[in-house]
Regions:
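Interdomain helical linkers/hinges and coiled-coil/dimerization scaffolds
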Residues: 108-264, 319-336
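Glycine- and acidic
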Residues: 201-202, 284-287, 364-365
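Hydrophobic alpha-helical membrane-association signature
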Residues: 13, 211, 215, 265, ...
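Generic solvent-exposed, charged/amphipathic alpha-helical segments
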Residues: 18, 216-220, 266-274, 303
Length: 445
């Protein structure tokens, strides 16, 4: 059963799509309707939305911006875009952000339902037990390992060994390996199969090989969907290396943060390995640098970030730039020093939210940027330090202030909604009732 969010600033279209989906017979648990991007983001943060159906041209926040913000919250969310404009530029932007379809208004009901079914198909796969996963792999896969020569050359390219001869981009190209760059980042994916498997029943060598091969293929498939040029290869018994690259044009395109792109890839990889293979993983992400020769440094960064999982066993995706090297490279660094650093970051974020919680369009990216860490790491530290996630804290402040204004002032509902950061009084009332169990008007009585 799936949860679908419809976003359109024309209420009649939203209602019509809601009715169409509700009577379709598709396995839908809940349908939500939002009238602008801000309302939609509240639903995405509060509910486990599987599919987003959004208009591309709306008021304060476009469908393109909504897609980007939605991916930051839930990188795996499926999206269908609807538009009154048959414009290639809009369609291209939507597809780059992972839209599964781009439909032109007036909508054809049959076409929309077909698109919804197709988008939900990928979500139908459930997490399998280890035994089911291995049985499926035995039946379905004829393992064709990647070329040993290609794997050796790629690992050599990342190696710190000064005596090794690094292959050139031209030499790699002859072998079918495209690494033109010129901008690169390195990700490491460490598979922890034994953490998901009872210690008294370890996998056979053959089964471990099957899982590793499946992980390589899932990684390649996921990266192909992101339209990022990449190379994936083995770099150890339980480890994959991923080289992400940007050409000059895509790197200079600032419409989407490169760090956000890498973070979304990392989180999607972690989730996919758990969902489809039942494997626990750790993902590390380097910074971005120019030139093929930078891969040695970037690989070193990714390796270092991977080691930081020992300090944070309850975290999964590590970005090198999040960690103060002066703290993490000292063997004598105490837990108190690390705890103090984490508190400073979390408290800085909390202070920023205290000042800006009523701002319409406040984003996790904005709060993270203000505190000089990635959104993923800030989310982790904030919840660990404060016992609630960042958006729960934003909502707490908004609801407490709106309750105070209702009880202590004569302000109207639309004025209070505006004051605490909501686009419409109707949406504010829904959130308020969900939070307190009564509507603003009932509290006012």
């Amino acid at each position: 059963m799936h949860r679908i969010l419809i976003v359109d600033d024309e209420p009649l279209i939203g209602q019509g799509l809601n009715s169409l989906l509700a009577s379709s017979g598709i396995g839908i648990e809940a349908i939500y309707v939002a009238h602008n991007g801000y309302e939609a983001l509240d639903y995405i943060r509060m509910e486990d939305i599987d599919l987003l159906i959004t208009d591309i041209q709306m008021g304060a926040m476009s469908g393109i911006e909504l897609m980007h913000q939605a991916k930051l919250v839930r990188p795996w969310i499926q999206t269908i875009v609807i538009s009154a404009h048959e414009t290639f530029q809009y369609a291209q932007l939507a597809m780059r952000l992972g839209a599964k379809d781009y439909l032109i208004k007036p909508l054809d009901g049959v076409q929309l339902l077909d698109s919804v079914r197709n988008a939900l198909l990928k979500l139908e796969k459930r997490s399998k037990s280890r035994e089911e996963t291995i049985d499926t792999l035995r039946d379905s896969f004829r393992v064709e390992e990647p070329s040993a020569l290609q794997t050796a050359l790629l690992n050599n390219l990342l190696s710190e060994d000064v005596n090794s001869m690094k292959p050139s981009a031209a030499e790699l190209h002859k072998l079918g390996i495209g690494l033109g760059g010129p901008y690169f980042a390195v990700l490491k994916l460490r598979l922890l199969p034994r953490s998901a498997i009872a210690s008294n029943n370890p996998p056979s060598e053959r089964d471990a090989q099957l899982l590793r091969y499946a992980a390589l293929n899932i990684t390649a498939e996921l990266l192909a969907e992101t339209e990022r040029k990449s190379v994936v290869f083995y770099s150890g018994a339980d480890e994959l290396s991923i080289v992400i690259q940007w050409d000059e044009e895509s790197y200079e395109n600032t419409s989407v943060s490169k760090l956000d792109q890498l973070d979304m890839i990392g989180r999607s990889l972690h989730r996919s390995m758990k969902r489809y293979l039942g494997l626990t993983t750790i993902v590390s992400i380097s910074q971005i640098a120019n030139g093929l020769q930078s891969l040695v440094l970037l690989n070193k960064q990714a390796m270092q970030a991977l080691q930081w999982s020992e300090r944070h066993p309850d975290h999964d995706v590590f970005y090198y730039g999040d960690f103060h090297e002066s703290l993490y490279t000292k063997e004598e660094t105490s837990e108190d020093e690390l705890h103090a650093q984490h508190n400073r970051i979390a408290e800085g974020a909390k202070a920023y939210i205290d000042r800006n919680y009523a701002q319409k369009g406040l984003t996790l990216h904005e709060v993270a940027q203000n505190n000089h860490v990635s959104p993923n790491y800030l989310s982790y530290l904030f919840k660990k330090t404060n016992g609630m996630n960042l958006w729960e804290y934003v909502m707490k402040l908004r609801m407490e202030e709106s309750r105070r204004l209702l009880l202590e002032t004569d302000m109207r509902r639309y004025e209070i909604a505006e004051r605490v950061g909501y686009e419409s009084p109707e949406h504010f009332s829904k959130i308020f009732k969900k939070y307190y169990g009564i509507s603003p008007s009932e509290l006012k009585k």
